[in-house]
């Protein structure tokens, strides 16, 4: 696969011999030899060249001199194009510092010094080490007659990949304002932590959350390498708990292997920094040294990163149910607030027996419970037409009865036929006029009934339909409050299913609705009375379209990258099918913006929303050529 912006990182915990840098050198080099050939960065634990648990041996010049010598030897034996971050003690200006050496292409780029030196409970580091705050200004370290910067305010910028590395050491992360936070403000998008974090009850969970959350706050990749069980067990146990996170997501975590890998997506991180500007506002104005280096380009990679085919839907069922019910509550709270603000106790909603209108009805029912309104104020209207099937009509009626709402059936057949006569349309011609006339007739009925009941019309269309423009302009496109507007189709099904799993009374009808093919039912049924017009046969799978939508709107990836990621996520789907779907997606996304620019109010529930008043602002006549050309070249 094309490299795109992926940066392959590794965290490694070698076996250590306490106080024996020569033996540790062999272990470190052994680990480096075992690395995948396309690894670009490897991070080792705190003080890995000597061992973290040397205690008063750190006073021994024999150990300190050997550690420095071993560092130089390792640097000379490093493979090309690999950044290695190694921990060791260094004596500088008659003080001992806990340091990380950043090494690349037989050179030392810089020395990062630990800032926060713990001296509490089991930690006693201030006995041996000084803080980076005690360094003299412009301190340097000599290597090959070259002055190497020594500081706690250095970032290392790779001009080839856009990776910018910031290093911190163990405790530097556990404080109120971590060192990595100022690194991020200085441009670091990959943060590395050399750690010696011991194990006590529940500390692993705390550590995991700490690393994960810091990667999220900094919009960064975070590589955490910790000392392992070969450290001294005189008083403590070290497990080698290594983590690689990206923007709040754990990409990899130590299980049994001493080396773990993570492919960091730099484009995604850089986009979020560009988009969420307040997070990158530097109010500290710390002076930083930037060390530039240039790696060799890597054009093709073995792609090992997990790509979720359903990015809107949690994989774990328990988590999914909790998330779905939370979304339902947010939707309902939005509607409840709107009704309360406008002093309205009635809503009108069209019910088809499909997923979207089912979810919207459930939202109305929940909103009425929040406001303590009578459910009879929900006026649920079924409007059978030329394409209505027995299954959907029956499910609609059962659901309305079980929810104890006011239900009414109004056929649109006579009204639409009269309309066909008025506009001189042949009802045997099943074209766009035939379909949209029905949608607009239904909307007219709902709007007029809302006047009659002093109510508002609740819209049922979802996020995926808005993305594709799969709605009739001024038909089902229009309402007075659109409760599903930021819920994608793949998630709608699971929200309805989650309610079914929690409600025995509604279970059977909701599960049958979930199993019903997605259709606007604007064309006549087949000869067996079943749905003939199936949306996904026309547009392509909503699974694919929601995937494209997420990658485009959340990460703003280019079409070619989205296509390649889709091929990874949907490996059982033919590539030609994916290509056909993505062509449809981009064509419709650009041509249908005019519908989104005048969409009704509706509450935002997730990270993606099309409200022209908030998240998505785009001219209706923008050119699609740049995007569709790239798609056509796939």
Range-by-range predicted roles:
Residues 161-163, 218-220, 232, 253, ...:
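ATP/NTP-dependent adenylation/nucleotidyl-transfer catalytic domains that generate, transfer
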Residues 1-350, 366-375:
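Enzyme catalytic cores with a strong preference for nitrogen-chemistry domains
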């Amino acid at each position: 696969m094309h490299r795109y912006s992926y940066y392959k990182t590794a965290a490694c915990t070698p076996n250590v011999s306490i106080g024996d840098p020569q033996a540790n050198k062999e272990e470190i080099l052994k680990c480096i030899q075992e690395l995948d050939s396309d690894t670009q960065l490897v991070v080792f634990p705190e003080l890995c060249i000597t061992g973290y648990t040397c205690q008063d041996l750190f006073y021994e010049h024999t150990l300190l001199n050997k550690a420095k010598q071993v560092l130089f030897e390792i640097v000379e034996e490093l493979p090309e194009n690999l950044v290695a971050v190694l921990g060791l003690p260094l004596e500088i200006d008659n003080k001992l510092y806990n340091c990380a050496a950043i090494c690349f292409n037989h050179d030392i780029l810089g020395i990062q010094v630990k800032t926060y030196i713990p001296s509490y409970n089991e930690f006693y580091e201030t006995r041996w080490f000084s803080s980076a705050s005690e360094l003299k200004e412009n301190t340097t370290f000599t290597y090959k007659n070259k002055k190497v910067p020594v500081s706690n305010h250095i970032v290392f910028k790779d001009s080839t990949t856009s990776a910018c590395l910031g290093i911190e050491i163990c405790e530097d992360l556990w404080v109120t304002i971590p060192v990595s936070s100022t690194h991020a403000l200085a441009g670091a998008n990959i943060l590395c932590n050399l750690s010696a974090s011991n194990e006590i009850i529940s500390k692993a969970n705390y550590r995991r959350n700490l690393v994960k959350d810091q990667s999220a706050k900094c919009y960064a990749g975070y590589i955490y390498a910790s000392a392992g069980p070969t450290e001294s067990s005189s008083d403590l146990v070290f497990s080698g708990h290594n983590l690689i996170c990206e923007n709040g997501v754990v990409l990899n975590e130590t299980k049994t292997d001493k080396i773990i890998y993570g492919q960091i997506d730099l484009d995604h991180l850089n986009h979020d920094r560009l988009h969420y500007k307040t997070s990158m506002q530097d109010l500290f104005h710390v002076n930083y040294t930037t060390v530039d280096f240039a790696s060799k380009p890597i054009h093709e990679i073995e792609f090992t990163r997990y790509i979720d085919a359903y990015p809107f839907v949690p994989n774990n069922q328990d988590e999914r149910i909790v998330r779905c019910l939370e979304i339902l509550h947010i939707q309902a709270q939005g509607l409840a607030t709107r009704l309360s603000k406008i002093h309205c106790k009635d809503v009108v909603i069209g019910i088809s027996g499909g997923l979207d209108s089912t979810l919207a009805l459930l939202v109305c029912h929940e909103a009425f419970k929040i406001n303590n309104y009578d459910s009879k104020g929900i006026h649920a209207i079924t409007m059978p037409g030329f394409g209505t099937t027995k299954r959907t009509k029956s499910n609609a009626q059962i659901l309305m009865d079980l929810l104890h709402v006011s239900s009414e059936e109004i056929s649109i057949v006579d009204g639409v036929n009269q309309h066909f006569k008025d506009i001189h349309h042949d009802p045997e011609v099943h074209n766009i006029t035939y379909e949209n006339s029905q949608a607009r007739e239904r909307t007219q009925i709902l709007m007029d009934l809302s006047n009659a009941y002093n109510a508002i019309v609740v819209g049922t269309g979802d996020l995926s339909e808005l993305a594709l423009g799969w709605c009739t302009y001024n038909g089902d496109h229009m309402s007075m409050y659109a409760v599903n507007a930021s819920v994608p189709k793949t998630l709608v099904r699971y929200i309805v299913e989650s309610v079914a799993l929690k409600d025995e009374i509604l279970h059977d009808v909701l599960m049958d609705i979930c199993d019903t093919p997605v259709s606007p039912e604007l064309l006549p049924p087949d000869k067996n009375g079943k749905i003939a017009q199936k949306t996904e046969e026309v547009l392509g799978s909503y699974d694919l379209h929601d995937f494209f939508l997420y990658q485009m709107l959340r990460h703003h990836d280019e079409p070619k990258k989205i296509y390649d990621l889709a091929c990874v996520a949907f490996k059982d789907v033919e590539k030609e099918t994916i290509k056909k779907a993505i062509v449809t997606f981009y064509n419709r996304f650009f041509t249908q913006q005019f519908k989104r620019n005048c969409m009704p109010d509706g509450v935002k529930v997730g990270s993606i929303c099309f409200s022209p008043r908030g998240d998505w602002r785009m001219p209706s006549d923008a050119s699609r050529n740049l995007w569709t050309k790239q798609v056509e070249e796939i």
